[in-house]
Amino acid sequence: MRTPDEAKEFPRRFYDEVFTKRNVKYAEGSVADDVVEHNPLDPRMGNDKSAAIASLQAILDNTPDLQVEILDMIATGDKVAIRSRFSGSDSGKGWGAPMGVPATGKSFSVEGIDVVSIDSDGRFTDHYGLFDVPAMMQQLGLMPG
């Protein structure tokens, strides 16, 4: 069994590769084939590995200038909880695109929580992710405040 500090390295590297370096291919090797995405970005995508990868790609496509800051991490056993801040602008495909609204160009900054389970090979097997979507939509002018 890995130590809490060792367990924290998996999501830390994942965030760096995927969100900072915009390397979605890294996720393909870091997410188990049988992963369960418990809170998909769009429920119509499903909750499997392809949905997890598609969600990551959608986040990057919608926010080309995305910055993610890890604020806290707690690890125990095979689980790691990550509190983070996502900031950027709606300048890509547009967060309102599913509603027929083009990108607004406005900026947002919201916090989120991810809880992941990690297998013995260092791959994510479960992901629970929640971030403050209403606040983001309000900041982007896509929802009344």
Where are these regions (language model features)?
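C-terminal and inter-domain tail/linker signature
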Residues: 1-145
